[in-house]
Amino acid sequence: MPNANAIANVFKLIEENNVKFVLLRFTDIKGKEHGVSIPVSLVDEDMFEDGKMFDGSSVEGWKTINKADMLLMPMAETAIVDPFAQIPTLSIRCSVYEPTTMQSYDRDPRSIAIRAENYMRSTGIADQAFFGPEPEFFLFDDVRFNVSMNKASFSIDDIEAAWNTNKKYEEGNNAYRPLKKGGYCAVAPIDSAHDIRSEMCLILEEMGLVIEAHHHEVATAGQNEIATKFNTLTLKADETQIYKHVVQNVALEHGKTACFMPKPITGDNGSGMHCNMSLSKDGKNIFQGDKYAGLSETALYYIGGIIKHAKALNAFTNPSTNSYKRLVPGYEAPVLLAYSASNRSASIRIPAVTNPKAIRVEARFPDPLANPYLAFAALLMAGLDGVVNKIHPGDAMDKNLYDLPPEELKDIPAVASSLEEALNSLEKDYEFLTQGGVFAKDFIDAFISIKRKEVERLNMAPHPVEFEMYYA
């Protein structure tokens, strides 16, 4: 049933902010946001019970044209004033429902996230799953690309880019920029985006997110990170969509363009989205214990589930062909499926904490192109499978995995090396996702089909590097 207090708050926000339109936002399979704007005169309490009809056949991977009608079901508790709309607009996040049954749609990512949380509670293992993602992004000055029968090119430029040390600017080249792999926690004047990130943080706070820190990241050409406080799974996925919305729009206001691709530039670090996770029951962190690095047995089993299902998980946590250009040795990307305390070369890390109650597990392979609803839900389901089936991850690996000799490396499993491998793995290893009806098999098949088209398109396209290697 709709939350009466939350609905009352919607009308309070409308009155206090002179709102003219209500924007109903929803997320598709690929993680892209869509929206339908409603004049405020048509917004009433019934809307939160009856929903708003829309054409599901126009969203890739959803309905066919002969069965197109679907419902946007507004979640009143997510209502927030959009700070970027010139006409006062209230945004409300929606789940997607079937109008014939008034049940959540099995291909709606937000509904999948909710079902994952409900399934977790039904197992009795935990009543809350906390997620703290760390999406990194680039801020570029200029991005161009061209794909046609006889051309394939892209061009990126930014005032901070290391390749601009010899560029002539009308106002002169001040030479303050991070060189390759030289940007981590840089300060002004090398960090040119400090005030832009600060503005992003202030707006994110206005929209309900809790900011923990922001800083320049490792790569040249304007790589950044804003750290926000954890939240429960679905709410944190909502917040991740808000995060991207704010980053992109503030960047635009400053003449920049924000890029969440994992590997937009060659030869420097890519952008990840490390995911911190913990489970709570009756208000207690059940990952806290007396095993390795202060973990509980439950936490170790959770890690075991993620490692076991990692290649299938990659389809959701690293859902682009570009993702696997980041997941290569040499750029601080976690390729090997091992766990360790504070060891950033492992794909599963147990961060150091000053308070044992804050103990958590960090999956380091996800990237910011992941649909947060699907990625978080899939990670939770893999972890729960580990707990239910007592999948122990084996011994921790505390050594630098990047420096291991070949004879040791061969015994350590790795993440998928391509989107195609990840999809093949998901095709074979999916039953952990369908427990409790969280991910429908029909949805998994649709997701694989959509992503295979992306793989096929890239496989069929000649690449400029091929001309460099093979033309003459």
Swiss-Prot record:
Sites bearing O-AMP-tyrosine, chain numbering: 402
Cofactor: how and how many bound: Binds 2 Mg(2+) ions per subunit.
Regulation: The activity of this enzyme could be controlled by adenylation under conditions of abundant glutamine.
Cofactor: Mg(2+)
GO cellular component: cytoplasm; membrane
Residues involved in Mg(2+) 1 binding: 134, 274, 362
Binding-site residues, L-glutamate: 269-270, 326, 332, 344, 364
Amino-acid positions noted as binding ATP in the UniProt annotation, renumbered to this chain: 212, 276-278, 344, 349, 357
InterPro entries to which the protein is assigned, alphabetical: Gln_synt_N, Gln_synt_N_sf, Gln_synth/guanido_kin_cat_dom, Gln_synth_cat_dom, Gln_synth_gly_rich_site, Gln_synth_I, Gln_synth_I_adenylation_site, Gln_synth_N_conserv_site
Cell location: Cytoplasm
UniProt entry keywords in alphabetical sequence: ATP-binding, Cytoplasm, Ligase, Magnesium, Metal-binding, Nucleotide-binding, Phosphoprotein
Family: Belongs to the glutamine synthetase family.
Oligomeric and partner information: Oligomer of 12 subunits arranged in the form of two hexameric ring.
Function field: Catalyzes the ATP-dependent biosynthesis of glutamine from glutamate and ammonia.
Name of protein: Glutamine synthetase
